[in-house]
Amino acid sequence: MTNQRRVLVTGGGGFLGRAIVERCLARGWNVRVTGRRVHADLTTRGVEFFAGEISDCQHIRQAARGCEAVFHVAAKAGVWGPRADYERINVGGTQSVIDACKAEGVPYLVHTSTPSVVFNGESFRGADEMLPYGRNWLCDYARTKAEAERRVRTAIVSGLRACSLRPHLIWGPRDPHIFPRILARARSGALSIIGDGNNQVDVTHVDTAADAHLSALEALIAGRANGQAYFLSQGEPVRLWEFINRLLKGAGLKPVTRRIPLPVAYAMGATLEATWATFRLSGEPPMTRFVATELAKDHWFDVSAARRDLQLRPAHDTWEALDRLAAELRSA
């Protein structure tokens, strides 16, 4: 690969995708982006947009033509929605990217996955990539992302050099998902601690995750990382509810103190899921079995492999970055 690289970022207008795009631009690379809509602020910086569906292989082939690498970030996230949508976007979309890389001779693929692919309802404390994929899925997001990751691993047999990255709980400036939801629920009085409130989780600043994606490409070029999956994080777990309450305090909100036992929250989630499915209600249920479990259990992983192969390191101190972000949210 030359220094003047041409790369494709699927989902490049999203939270993580945009951070990757900005790093590629900073290196002087030619950047293409696929997505459902054009982002004018990126086109003015020279980004070439290809608007269309990720599951349309011909569309992805056109976008990938002449590229030297693809960062496949696009996905349907969330814990609720039509199963067919998760299949089409997360599985079908990933297969389209793989097929496009093969057809257009793109040698390198960095796939954004998730630790949810190993979800089994239990706590993880320092677990590594030897963990098997989950089986008893509680949401289609985790199930379809696991299948997508399997397909990426299988694709290396045909000569594609690829790896999958599993960042846990991505957050940071411009986060459109996690923090806005937490703040909205806190303001409405609907936020509760699930479980005993002492569970530890990994968190990943968006800059840490974006840096790791570019490092993964360099690792593939250097002959490392091919066929591998890597957990990503800041490298030190945090107590989830301490983290959330520090965010709330910095944003000028009261800390959450009300507790709901996990069995109660889990049963509530099952009931709400059934209600939403039966009556085909719009939006996500306010609680699901998957969310209840994630909010109450330990989820932190050994990132030694990413440190070794990708030179993973946090882009910012976790608590300092959280305080800065909370202050920005308070003044917004």
Predicted segments, located by residue:
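Conserved C-terminal active-site "lid" loop/helix of NAD(P)H-dependent oxidoreductases
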Residues: 206, 245, 268-313
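Substrate-positioning beta->alpha
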Residues: 147-148, 176-181, 195-218, 227-228
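Mid/C-terminal beta-alpha module of Rossmann-like enzyme folds, strongest
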Residues: 219-285, 319, 323-326
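Conserved Rossmann-fold NAD(P)-dependent oxidoreductase catalytic core, especially the SDR/UDP-sugar
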Residues: 92, 96-140
